[in-house]
């Protein structure tokens, strides 16, 4: 089996263990799966880094049959020296934190307590670097206790043993030579069962890998020589857009900033950051309401921090009536307005319009951004949507729009498009692409979905970059042309209407017209006959007084 197949098998086994203890698709299952998976990843990563440390002591670890035993046998002094030789991006684990140590403790009756204490001790000892935080600066630890999710206390120790059993016979070591694409596919598989944020729930959408790749490549380019870039996602979800963006720039050449209100998303984002080696960005992964309490501010704390790149796949509609008044009281920030609170169906409030404004406000004067929006927005005729459209066209901020296939997102049946912004306003034309007919259909569970093929991704990227007009696919238009069309960013409204001409003789034309007339005459005659027959049948109907 390949390392990818083995990793997927591990995920399946962990999920099966949860199901066996009554937590299959339980609200807490994702906490267990993501944490245990991450624990195993960090355990193996720690061993890998020990073996490759720049220290004479590391040779002893590397040559040992079992690195865990060799590490445990070191004196406290030598162990500390070895730990100090590691990168700050590597969590420090003591011998009693290791999976091998837990394995040897399984016969103890209070193994659930031992297991949980190990988790919390790792989190406490690495809290300085390996924590995220809330908008109120409350630290969110790396790990938490897990066995209490098993309701029956008598089964908790057995549950902990079952989890450890799944970890001992697998190693991530071969995966540490892999790169972004490997971990992106593993992460997508890991969270697919938890990607169920339907009904407009806030910011738990997972952006398909292909869409994230398109957004990153079009914003950054394929060979950009960038350094010290700051990237931001105000509705980060599980971090897919940010991972694609950082990979495109170069993980070592950018810092990631994020915010999201969801506790679940924060846990998964943390996992995603660690899998992709973005440990330094953990401190900027904030849990909290971006619109009400944006955490990332300028140095003086008086305005929003501005970034080189901003990406977002926000919730489209949701009930934010509880905070609407606070947002509406900030007209300078929400310059196009904030949706009113309706009397009914508050869950239909178009919160994405606030996120568009926030994205634009968060871009540097030379910054670029991209945001996923419902396709209906790009042809809006009035309201907040139209005011935003007018602003981004008049200011020359929008430089592209790609309309995606339907059912390409797991959590919404809404047709979506991606808007691209450049605050430097240097584009002469706007490239509009209609990719709605692209994609191959596939079934996931009971859902019929679509995904873009690799060749289709390449076509979208190359057409966009070249600002190329392709029949029934793309068009490059000036800002004045967009204004003449009522500020529409729909590619279809700019396509030329083509009339196909067929070269035929006058005799062929006359014969065709005679045939059409004959067919229509016969059909009209039949229609009249049926009309008379129906009326005759209706006239024959009488009311029967004898039926009681």
For each feature predicted by the language model, list its residue ranges.
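Alpha-helix N-cap/helix-initiation motif
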Residues: 158-162, 201-204, 254, 258, ...
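Membrane-interface junctions
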Residues: 189, 221, 225, 362-365
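Flexible interhelical turns and helix-capping residues at alpha-helix boundaries
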Residues: 22-25, 223, 249, 363
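Conserved S-adenosyl-L-methionine
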Residues: 201-312, 317-328, 338, 373-376, ...
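A conserved structural/catalytic subdomain of Rossmann-like adenosyl-cofactor enzymes
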Residues: 304-548
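Generic recognition of flexible, low-complexity loop/linker segments
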Residues: 19, 273, 292-300, 358-359, ...
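Non-catalytic, mostly N-terminal accessory regions of nucleic-acid modification and defense proteins
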Residues: 1-214, 218-219, 281-290, 403-406, ...
């Amino acid at each position: 089996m390949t390392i990818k197949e083995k990793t997927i098998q591990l995920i399946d086994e962990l999920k099966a263990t949860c199901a066996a203890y009554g937590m299959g698709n339980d609200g807490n299952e994702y906490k267990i799966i993501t944490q245990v998976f991450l624990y195993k990843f960090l355990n193996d990563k720690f061993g890998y880094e020990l073996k490759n440390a720049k220290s004479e002591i590391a040779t002893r670890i590397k040559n040992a049959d079992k690195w865990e035993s060799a590490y445990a046998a070191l004196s406290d002094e030598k162990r500390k020296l070895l730990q100090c030789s590691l990168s700050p991006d590597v969590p420090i684990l003591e011998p009693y934190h290791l999976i091998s140590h837990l394995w040897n403790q399984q016969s103890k009756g209070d193994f659930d307590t031992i297991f949980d204490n190990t988790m919390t001790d790792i989190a406490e000892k690495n809290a300085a670097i390996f924590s995220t935080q809330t908008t109120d600066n409350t630290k969110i630890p790396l790990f938490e206790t897990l066995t209490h999710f098993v309701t029956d206390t008598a089964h908790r120790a057995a549950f902990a043993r079952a989890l450890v059993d799944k970890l001992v016979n697998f190693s991530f070591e071969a995966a540490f030579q892999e790169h972004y694409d490997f971990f992106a596919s593993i992460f997508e598989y890991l969270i697919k069962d938890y990607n169920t944020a339907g009904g407009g729930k806030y910011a738990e959408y997972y952006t398909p890998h292909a869409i994230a790749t398109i957004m990153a490549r079009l914003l950054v380019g394929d060979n950009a020589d960038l350094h010290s870039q700051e990237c931001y996602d105000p509705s980060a979800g599980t971090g897919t857009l940010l991972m694609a963006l950082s990979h495109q720039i170069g993980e070592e050449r950018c810092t990631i900033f994020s915010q999201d209100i969801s506790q679940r998303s924060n846990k998964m984002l943390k996992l995603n950051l660690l899998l992709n080696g973005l440990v330094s960005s953990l401190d900027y992964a904030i849990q909290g309401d971006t619109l009400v309490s944006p955490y990332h501010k300028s140095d003086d704390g008086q305005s929003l921090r501005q970034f080189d790149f901003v990406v977002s796949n926000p919730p489209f509609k949701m009930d934010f009536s509880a905070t609407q008044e606070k947002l509406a009281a900030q007209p300078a920030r929400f310059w196009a307005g904030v949706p009113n609170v309706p009397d009914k169906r508050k869950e239909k409030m178009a919160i994405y319009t606030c996120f568009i404004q926030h994205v634009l406000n968060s871009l540097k004067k030379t910054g670029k951004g991209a945001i996923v929006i419902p396709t209906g927005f790009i042809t809006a005729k009035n309201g907040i949507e139209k005011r935003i459209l007018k602003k981004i066209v008049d200011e020359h901020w929008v430089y592209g729009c790609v309309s995606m296939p339907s059912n390409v997102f797991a959590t919404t049946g809404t047709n979506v498009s991606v808007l691209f912004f450049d605050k430097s306003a240097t584009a002469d034309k706007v490239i509009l692409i209609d990719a709605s007919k692209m994609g191959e259909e596939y079934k996931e569970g009971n859902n019929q979905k679509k995904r873009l093929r690799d060749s289709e991704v390449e076509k979208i990227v190359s057409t966009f970059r070249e600002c190329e007009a392709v029949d029934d696919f793309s068009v490059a238009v000036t800002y004045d042309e967009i204004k003449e069309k009522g500020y529409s960013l729909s590619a279809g409204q700019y396509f030329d209407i083509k009339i196909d001409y067929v070269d035929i003789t006058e005799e062929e034309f006359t014969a065709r017209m005679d045939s059409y007339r004959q067919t229509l005459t016969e059909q009209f005659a039949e229609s009249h006959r049926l009309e008379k027959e129906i009326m005759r049948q209706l006239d024959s109907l009488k009311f029967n007084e004898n039926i009681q």
